[in-house]
């Protein structure tokens, strides 16, 4: 550590150190959703202090997940030492310094303390427009627009487009673009997109087959037992409601034989699309399906009224 203090951090490494009050020994996690680095690292706090160092070849937006399940972001840059200081009970408000972008992000976070949610969202929009070329703006987008709390899907899409236009080669922006664009394009209030696919029985289906009908598009994957539970709950709920919906299952499984057995075991005979491409399936991309299991609810006018519903009891069938 003496050598580090004397020479500083190497050009291909980053150092993240901090001091938190009102905590002795604990740990939290650091990771990159967008692929800035692989895996999840554990940062250990001892006597209220921590030091974390890793190899880094480019600036990375990293997520910090704390023991109380709150989350914040830090921008890691090669050759830099980044410092965090604050109170453990309000760790999301801790000051992060050491680079211009982290200080910009800290100033924004500090300015939002005590503001109403509406004013915070307005400030986030203004921040992204003003600082669209920064990684700090990407962090603000993730905190405010890549969240179920944001109901204005059109504004979320506009913010994503603003970032993409300003940073077309930024790996994090491109990841968010590919992930969220289909979701925003098919958000609540939007029309069911045009599609064409073949069921496991060899029948061609398109959006026209469901015109004038209520539809549930259900994403399943039987590598997780949650899909069995979700479908059982769904079937029970539909039976109780007099089954007023058409159901289209989109399976992300790669083994059709195993899929067929699973569906037979729970007595489900809805039409199934399974092209064995999992999350790379063109149809999955068209619908913006990202959670397994989950459901999208479409009314008889072809309008999406719910999406990404991951719990059966949260489904609204009274439309």
Residues covered by each model-derived region:
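N-terminal "domain-start" segment that seeds a small globular fold
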Residues: 174-207, 318-319
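Structural microenvironment flanking redox-active thiols in thiol-disulfide oxidoreductases
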Residues: 228-266, 278-285
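Short active-site neighborhood of thiol/selenol oxidoreductases, capturing the structured segment around
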Residues: 205-234, 246-247
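Sec-dependent bacterial lipoprotein signal peptides
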Residues: 1-5
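A non-transmembrane, solvent-exposed segment enriched in polar/low-complexity residues
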Residues: 7-130
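N-terminal targeting signals for export/organelle localization
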Residues: 7-8, 117-188
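Short, small/polar residue-rich loop motifs at catalytic or cofactor-binding pockets
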Residues: 37-38, 191, 290-292
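Thiol/disulfide oxidoreductase modules built on the thioredoxin-like
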Residues: 266-268, 275-319
């Amino acid at each position: 550590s003496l050598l580090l203090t004397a020479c500083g951090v190497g050009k291909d490494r980053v150092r993240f150190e901090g001091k938190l009050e009102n905590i002795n020994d604990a740990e939290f996690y650091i990771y990159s959703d967008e692929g800035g680095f692989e895996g999840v690292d554990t940062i250990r706090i001892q006597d209220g202090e921590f030091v974390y160092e890793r190899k880094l070849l480019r600036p990375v937006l990293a997520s910090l997940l704390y023991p109380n399940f709150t989350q914040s972001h830090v921008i890691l840059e090669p050759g830099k030492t980044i410092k965090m200081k604050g109170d453990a009970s309000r760790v999301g408000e801790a000051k992060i310094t050491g680079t211009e972008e982290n200080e910009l992000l800290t100033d924004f976070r500090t300015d939002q303390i005590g503001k109403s949610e509406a004013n915070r969202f307005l400030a986030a929009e203004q921040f992204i427009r003003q600082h669209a070329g920064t990684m700090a703006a990407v962090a603000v987008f993730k905190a405010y627009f890549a969240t179920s709390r944001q109901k204005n899907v059109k504004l979320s899409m506009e913010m994503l487009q603003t970032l993409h236009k300003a940073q077309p080669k930024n790996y994090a922006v491109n990841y968010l673009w590919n992930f969220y664009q289909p979701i925003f394009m098919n958000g609540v209030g939007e029309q069911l997109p045009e599609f064409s696919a073949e069921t496991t029985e060899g029948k061609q289906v398109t959006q026209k087959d469901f015109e004038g009908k209520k539809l549930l598009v259900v994403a399943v994957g039987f590598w997780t037992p949650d899909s069995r539970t979700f479908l059982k709950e769904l079937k029970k709920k539909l039976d109780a409601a007099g089954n007023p919906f058409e159901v289209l299952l989109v399976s992300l499984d790669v083994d059709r034989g195993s899929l067929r057995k699973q569906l037979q075991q729970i007595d489900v005979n809805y039409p199934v699309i399974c092209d064995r491409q999992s999350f790379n399936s063109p149809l999955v991309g068209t619908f913006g399906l990202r959670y397994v299991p989950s459901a999208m609810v479409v009314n008889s006018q072809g309008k999406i009224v719910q999406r990404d519903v991951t719990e059966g009891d949260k489904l609204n069938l009274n439309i």
